[in-house]
Swiss-Prot record:
GO terms for cellular component: nucleolus. The lineage of its organism: Eukaryota, Metazoa, Chordata, Craniata, Vertebrata. Ubiquitous. This is Protein maestro. It comes from Homo sapiens. SUPFAM superfamilies: ARM repeat (SSF48371). HEAT repeats lie at residues 128-163. It is found in: Nucleus, Nucleolus. Residues 1-21 are annotated as: Disordered. Pfam families: HEAT_MROH2B_C (PF23227). Gene3D superfamilies: Leucine-rich Repeat Variant. The keyword Acetylation does not apply. Its main location: nucleus. InterPro entries: ARM-like, ARM-type_fold, HEAT_Maestro, Maestro_heat-like_prot. Keywords: Nucleus.
Amino acid sequence: MDQRQRRILGQPLSIPTSQPKQKRTSMISFFSKVSWKLRFQKREPLKNVFFILAERARDPSAKKRHMAMRNLGTMAYEAPDKVRKYKKIVLDLLVYGLYDPVNLEVIHESMKTLTVVLGKIQGKGLGSFFIDITLQTRTLLDDENDSLRYSAFVLFGQLAAFAGRKWKKFFTSQVKQTRDSLLIHLQDRNPQVAKACKTTFQACSPYLKLKEEYSFQSEEDQRNTKLYQQLSHYHPEILQFFYANKIL
């Protein structure tokens, strides 16, 4: 792989600083996705792709770490079969980003990408990653950042659908420790977070063994495992649109 190819791979482009930060970020994201599509079209050896992503996921630069998480999300959309094949490598990098010690953007991007990846693999073969993801996601349910809270509730609800027999006992203990957060954020100051919390609360109700009157279940507003598995295919931004427009 020559130097020009390496430069194409998701590195931030030189954009005039006079542009608004949000616009610069969206342009970087756009060109990053384009570069990844070109790489898949050229069938770049995956070992090279993962080697570069692994380097950037651990780079001292928060921007490069953030870009690595975003590129993994692009990969999940563009080549879900490859993600399923190399899920252990992908999950390892995403969990590493989820535990980023200093940068909330890296953590947030990791959560959003995990939501996509877990949907693609239907929660199968998570192994001990299930524990790592659950423990960290729990800590973010009460974060001051609205976007982080929203993504954390979406991901936690998804984990409830994929716990299965293997992790039922563990996840039950986690849900019980999270009960106060679930109840508090049903009245979250951000209405979109509150709706995400309500959906997650319903997903977690079986683990809490709540009585019917406290389970928020009704004929018009009933959720089940199949629905959560369907929702898991959506990116958090799409779910946010559903919530905002009262589709859910």
